[in-house]
């Protein structure tokens, strides 16, 4: 559900809000883990979208690694295990790291708290 729409809400605002909602859901899921992740990697089609990668970094308040040649990751991971070279992935694969922007992360932290309070109410709507 979209909350807070007004006549000035543009299509781009709604698209961004959809991405933010997914990012908030990912954060909610990650908060259920027993331990915080040390690394977060993103692969697939969404990893090609800079805005999505940055939204994730800001919402999760954690760097996001994006590997340019993700298709070889399984083979590199296997070789890393077989040859006992733990840092092989970092030395073989080109990686872009999206760092959280502290100001944006604070804004998203406030929005995430609102998301957590609204989500239970909206979830019951049919």
Predicted regions and their residues:
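Glycine/Thr-rich phosphate-binding loops that ligate phosphate moieties of nucleotide
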Residues: 1-126
């Amino acid at each position: 559900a979209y909350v807070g729409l007004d006549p000035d809400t543009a299509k781009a605002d709604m698209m961004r809000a959809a991405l933010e909602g997914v990012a908030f859901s990912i954060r909610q899921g990650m908060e259920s883990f027993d331990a915080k992740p040390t690394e977060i990697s993103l692969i697939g089609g969404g990893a090609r979208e800079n805005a999505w990668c940055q939204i994730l970094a800001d919402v999760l308040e954690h760097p996001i690694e994006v590997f340019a040649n993700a298709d070889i990751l399984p083979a590199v991971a296997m070789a890393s295990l077989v040859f006992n070279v733990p840092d092989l992935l970092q030395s073989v694969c080109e990686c872009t790291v999206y760092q959280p922007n502290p100001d944006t992360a604070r804004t998203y932290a406030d929005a995430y708290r609102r998301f957590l309070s609204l989500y239970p109410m909206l979830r019951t709507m049919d």
